[in-house]
Amino acid sequence: MRLRTAIFGVLLFLQSALVVTGGAVRLTGSGLGCPTWPECTPGSYTPVPHQAEGQLHAWIEFGNRLLTFALLLSALIAVIYVLKSGRKDLRTLAAAQVLGILGQGVLGGITVLTDLHPLPVAGHLLLSMLLIAGAASLYSRREAPQF
């Protein structure tokens, strides 16, 4: 049970941390710090020296992208963990986390490629809120009896 608490707790923490770093991206004007997607700049997946967008903006955006990989790993661990449980509710919520994170990657790319058009930006935030709600539900159900 402690392992389940740790796995779901880390997932919830990382989902929340991603919203915080996404807010930092938005508040610092770093949304196009990496002006291409999936690469950061043409020909490089990481920021490059003397990047036109500035190193600070590039690294803020790149850091947000990197955190997504830690989050995806955490969600995959949660899926693997709940596969052996008999709890369909946990399996569904964990699988939705993985699918939602992958969807966030695509939506993040659309957001960059549309030069931060308000609709994909809003969709990106809305999906983040849904993913946090799902992670919170996983965490709150960690000790709930199976029905």
Annotated model-derived regions:
Residues 56-77, 119-133:
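Membrane-interface loop-to-helix entry segments
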